[in-house]
């Protein structure tokens, strides 16, 4: 098991690999207290830096590095779709603290990724992965609905980005 902060024997597997995929990061499905916030940011930034160092030290580095990121980085808006050309968030006047924090995490995560010196990098800005597995976000949302706590959130016009677990898996299967 990798701690996400140190290089170990796993770095040997990078040497000569075609692709490296880093999906490391503490779950955001938790209370946003100080300890969890610190773990959310550290687990993403530190693991990204360590993977970048391992790639930089490889005698035969991979051609591509796929790095997890998040759609949370985009501004909350109704007027346009968010894609790689979209407006980044964090400057919205009415954004709650938890939104700002999530955007700050995303920016720090991507900055650590951009600082890496590797050939080709791809930031996988993905959203919640919905699966029937116990303990996932779908399980959490269904638990709320079963208790009568589901329904429209806010004004009901906002979008919730998500990806089906099988589609998420297939993007790596080749």
Over which residues does each language-model region extend?
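NAD(P)H-binding glycine-rich loop region in Rossmannoid oxidoreductase-like domains
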Residues: 1-50
């Amino acid at each position: 098991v990798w701690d996400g902060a140190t290089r170990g024997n796993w770095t040997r597997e990078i040497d000569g690999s075609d692709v490296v995929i880093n999906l490391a990061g503490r779950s955001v499905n938790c209370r946003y207290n100080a300890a969890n916030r610190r773990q959310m940011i550290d687990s993403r930034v530190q693991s990204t830096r360590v993977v970048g160092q391992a790639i930089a030290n490889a005698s035969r580095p991979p051609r591509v590095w796929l790095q997890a990121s998040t759609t949370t980085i985009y501004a909350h808006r109704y007027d346009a779709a968010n894609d790689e050309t979209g407006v980044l968030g964090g400057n919205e006047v009415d954004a709650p603290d938890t939104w700002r924090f999530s955007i700050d995490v995303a920016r720090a995560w991507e900055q650590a990724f951009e600082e890496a010196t590797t050939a080709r990098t791809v930031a996988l800005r993905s959203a919640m992965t919905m699966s029937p597995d116990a303990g996932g976000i779908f399980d959490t949302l269904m638990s709320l609905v079963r208790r009568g706590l589901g329904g429209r959130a806010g004004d009901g016009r906002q979008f919730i980005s998500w990806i089906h677990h099988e589609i998420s898996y297939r993007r790596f299967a080749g």
